[in-house]
């Protein structure tokens, strides 16, 4: 699996925003995502082909740095229902593995309108970047139909209130 580039992009963008004094909250509806997200900054859009559960799939990401953290929403369309659970699990494992996460905590994801799924989880963990710097990661993994989503915040310190606003700010328009 080649997710380190996702982490590299996120961390590079975070370093650009380290001097940003304020958060500028905005609703963002990424074209083709089917979801509206509440970002504390104006996200850039990126796309990458990844190998997930044995298939090459296009993952699209909205990413922005703010307040010493990187905020990201990623989404990928899965070709068949039987692959939704494995893709959710693989994305979660990769996100935690990319920062060598230690002792993650998890709870069921609760996004109004999502497809109920046992692999839809919120996670929080402490980890380390390749250079040894300590980071906190908080993320939510969920699906609607055949589209799988990952919302994540990665930063050098946890900002519980800001992280919560972002991670609970996803919604599916009517």
Task: Please place each PLM-identified region on the residue numbering.
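Proline-anchored loop/turn motifs at beta-strand termini and strand-loop-strand connectors
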Residues: 32-49, 167
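Surface-exposed amphipathic alpha-helical segments
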Residues: 43-45, 87-102, 145-174
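C-terminal motif of bacterial Sec signal peptides marking the signal peptidase cleavage site
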Residues: 15-18
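Bacterial N-terminal signal peptides that target proteins for export
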Residues: 1-11
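Short aromatic-glycine motifs in intrinsically disordered, low-complexity regions
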Residues: 25-36, 154-157
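Bacterial signal peptide processing site
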Residues: 20-22
């Amino acid at each position: 699996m080649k997710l380190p580039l996702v982490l590299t992009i996120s961390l590079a963008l975070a370093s650009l925003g380290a001097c940003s004094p304020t958060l500028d909250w905005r609703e963002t509806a990424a074209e083709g995502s089917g979801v509206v997200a509440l970002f504390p900054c104006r996200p850039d859009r990126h796309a990458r082909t990844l190998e997930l559960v044995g298939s090459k799939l296009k993952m699209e990401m909205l990413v922005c740095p703010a307040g010493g953290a990187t905020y990201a929403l990623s989404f990928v369309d899965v070709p068949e229902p039987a692959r939704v659970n494995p893709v959710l699990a693989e994305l979660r494992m990769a996100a935690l593995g990319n920062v060598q996460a230690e002792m993650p905590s998890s709870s069921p994801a609760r996004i109004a309108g999502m497809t109920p799924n046992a692999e839809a989880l919120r996670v929080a963990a402490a980890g380390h970047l390749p250079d040894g710097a300590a980071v906190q990661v908080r993320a939510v993994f969920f699906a609607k139909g055949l589209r799988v989503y990952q919302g994540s915040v990665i930063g050098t310190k946890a900002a519980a209130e800001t992280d919560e606003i972002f991670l609970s700010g996803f919604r599916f328009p009517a």
